[in-house]
Structure formats: structure tokens, C-alpha cells
Amino acid sequence: MSQRPNPSALIWLLLSAVVIGLDQWSKAWVLSSLPEYTPVPVIDGFWNWYRTYNTGAAFSFLSDAGGWQLWFFTALAVGISGLLAFWLSRTARGDWRSAVPYALVIGGAIGNVIDRLMHGHVVDFIQWYVGEHTWPSFNIADSAIVGGAIGIALFGLFDGKRSRKAG
């Protein structure tokens, strides 16, 4: 009799699909409801809806590079998502410490890829600020990418300490 393989964490791609769905739904709302480049207060003194566009990457990195960055960041996001999906296929289903961060990054990356391919830029709309200090605008996909990256770093750090203590 052959032994059944352990189920992989690919089921966690459903979380990626939820992130993509929420991201695209929120951006459709923004495009149909918010004026461009006009702050709409949510929490006065801290949070605005602010419809803007980003042709670059995080913090508008390379946003004025002339157009090639659209394809570069699209290819980078698809490549990283493919690598993380491969790692998910090698991860045990119950290993949520690895699976959830991977799935969040995949969902966020693909959400922004959809924007780049549909609009030629990423739609950003969440703006946080204190006084005159404004954080760069972002979206749900960006939040998922950052949350996933933090999870990968933190869980990797803690798991590394745990395995060193066990060894």
C-alpha cells in the first residue's frame, strides 16, 4: 500500500483570493466614488480617503522611470507569487505560520498586478497623517503585502530561535 502524501498548504490560496477580492472591490468603489487627489476625512487629523495613482512600487519608487517599470514590477510580483505558491505546495496544511504570510503576499501582489494590467498603475486610496506628516497613500493589497512580509520575518525569526533551542 502506498502512503498518502501530507496535504499541502495550497488551500491557503483561498486567503489570497479573499485579499484579491477585497482589494479589487475596494478599488472599484474608489474609482466610482472618490474624487481624484481630494482628501475625504475618515478620522479627522489622522485618516483620509485620498484617490491617487502609483506607477512605481512602494513609496512610489521608480514612479517617474518612463514606463518600463510597469512590466518590471508586474514580472517581479508574478515571479514572487509563483515562488511563494511553490513554497506553499511544499508546506504542511497546518503550518499557518508559513502559509498565512505567504498567502497574504500572494494576494496583495496579484491585486496590484491586476491594477497595473487594467489601468497602467496601482490605485491607492488610504492616507494616514499626523499634522503635516503624511504617510504615502496605500491600498488593501499593500497592507496584505506588508502584513505578510512582517509575518514571514517574525515567524521565521521565532521559528529559528525555537529550532536552535531544540537542537
Swiss-Prot record:
Q: Which InterPro entries match?
A: Peptidase_A8
Reading the lineage from the top rank, the first entry is Bacteria
Q: Does the keyword Nuclease apply?
A: no
Catalytic residues (positions): 124, 142
Q: Where in the cell is it found?
A: Cell inner membrane
- One GO term describing the cellular component: plasma membrane
The protein's UniProt keywords, in alphabetical order, are: Aspartyl protease, Cell inner membrane, Cell membrane, Hydrolase, Membrane, Protease, Transmembrane, Transmembrane helix
Which PROSITE patterns does the annotation name? SPASE_II
Transmembrane intervals: 10-30, 68-88, 98-118, 138-158
**Lineage from the top down?**
Bacteria, Pseudomonadati, Pseudomonadota, Gammaproteobacteria, Lysobacterales
The similarity annotation says: Belongs to the peptidase A8 family.
Q: What's the encoding gene here?
A: lspA
One GO biological process term: proteolysis
Q: What is this protein called?
A: Lipoprotein signal peptidase
Q: Which reaction does this enzyme catalyse, per its entry?
A: Release of signal peptides from bacterial membrane prolipoproteins. Hydrolyzes -Xaa-Yaa-Zaa-|-(S,diacylglyceryl)Cys-, in which Xaa is hydrophobic (preferably Leu), and Yaa (Ala or Ser) and Zaa (Gly or Ala) have small, neutral side chains
**This enzyme's EC code(s):** 3.4.23.36
Q: Which PANTHER family match?
A: LIPOPROTEIN SIGNAL PEPTIDASE (PTHR33695:SF1)
Q: Name one GO molecular function term.
A: endopeptidase activity
Please give the function described in this protein's UniProt entry.
This protein specifically catalyzes the removal of signal peptides from prolipoproteins.
Query: Which pathway does it operate in?
Result: Protein modification; lipoprotein biosynthesis (signal peptide cleavage)
Q: Topology in the membrane? A: Multi-pass membrane protein
* Chief place where the protein resides: membrane
